Design a protein with these regions (language model features):
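Phosphate-binding loop and its immediate beta->loop->alpha context
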Residues: 22-158
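Short, glycine/acidic-enriched loop or turn micro-motifs at the edges of active sites
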Residues: 13, 132-134, 162
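A short acidic Gly-Thr/Ser loop motif
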Residues: 9-15, 175
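Short glycine-aspartate micro-motif
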Residues: 4-11, 127
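Conserved phosphate-binding catalytic cores of ATP/NTP-utilizing and phosphoryl-transfer enzymes
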Residues: 1-4, 155-175
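Short beta-strand-initiation
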Residues: 2-4, 13, 33, 37
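Classical protein tyrosine phosphatase
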Residues: 17-19
């Protein structure tokens, strides 16, 4: 088993990003629109294509009905803020897919999109930062989403721990 972590992911409620260390410098991988982050937004069109990130967000913004799903019941095809329901039994009804989707499935689509920015075919392991307030069910749901996205080895790191670690590494280099 390999201990090296290849990439770090911020799977955010609003936006998400992927980065790795390159020559000792943390480097965020740019999206196809050359942005550091993508919206944590998923849309399913009538052809059942899955749109993620900026494309999905733009569809949502331009949608005349402005049908978006957070916690209300009803059918929609664009989903945002599903991270808030990770680790619960909440499902999202998607009219174009004629099925219910879990927060883990929607999060997996965001993770797959981030994974697509990576040229490394041997991508093996990742660290995903999670909020400090996440409990075991939410952590397990995040792990499930990563597995659904095809990541083989996943570690979770609480956001304050990640910040302290980064500060410690920076401070250590200045001493």
């Amino acid at each position: 088993m390999r201990n090296k972590i290849d990439y770090g992911i911020d799977l955010g409620t609003t936006n998400s990003a992927i980065a790795r260390m390159e020559n000792g410098v943390p480097t965020i991988k740019k999206s196809e629109t050359l942005k550091d982050t993508i919206p944590s937004c998923v849309h399913f069109n009538k052809r059942q294509d899955i749109l993620v990130g900026d494309t999905a967000f733009n569809v949502m913004k331009n949608d005349n009905t402005r049908a978006l799903k957070t916690f209300e019941s009803g059918k929609t095809n664009t989903f945002i803020e599903f991270k808030r329901t990770m680790g619960t039994t909440h499902n999202y009804e998607c009219s174009n897919m004629s099925k219910n989707l879990t927060p883990e499935e929607l999060s997996a689509e965001v993770l797959k999109k981030l994974k697509s920015f990576i040229q490394d075919e041997n991508l093996y392991s990742i660290v995903i930062t999670v909020p400090a307030k996440f409990l075991n069910p939410q952590n397990e749901a995040t792990m499930k989403a990563a597995k659904l996205a095809g990541f083989k080895h996943v570690q979770l790191l609480q956001e304050p721990v990640a910040a302290a670690t980064a500060y410690g590494l920076t401070a250590k280099n200045k001493d």
